[in-house]
């Protein structure tokens, strides 16, 4: 119980500190609406669940110790973040009149496509993030009692991390959607898109070099 209470604030800090997930949730919520943001969060939770299963099977340690596997995941993740960053940097203003009309028409005809894209971005950004592997290999074991059921404890710790992430990003989606009416200035949107792109590329480069 004591170790669990010590783990919760650490997990909360890992979630709250801005990263690639934060930028993706902000971008998709602003561009496609709160529902797309929630699908992004669902993808994020799916990615974390994927690594939970991997950890339970003992494969996270294998991946962390395998230079080839870990490096492959690292570079794939870096390339994916850079791709998303470049795409965001060169994207049109989210709220230009033509873009809004075109987007409204496209979403009305095939909304699932946008939600699927948001979901996949959330999933892949976590599945291809080597730092997620390290959380399961280096941080969580510090709060596991080796005399107890290790898998059960791992599931509890991972569930807490996932729950905190979902709650935090749902709150972020709500705030962004509420503030959207003050963020429709085209100049603001252009600056935001480019800053988002630069930050994502920066995260990608940092991931590749770490």
From Swiss-Prot:
GO terms for cellular component: plasma membrane. The chain crosses the membrane at residues 5-25, 50-70, 75-95, 155-175. GO terms for molecular function: amino acid transmembrane transporter activity. Its main location: membrane. It is a multi-pass membrane protein. Keywords: Cell membrane, Membrane, Transmembrane, Transmembrane helix. It is found in: Cell membrane. GO terms for biological process: amino acid transport. Belongs to the Rht family. This is Uncharacterized membrane protein YrhP. The lineage of its organism: Bacteria, Bacillati, Bacillota, Bacilli, Bacillales. The gene is yrhP.
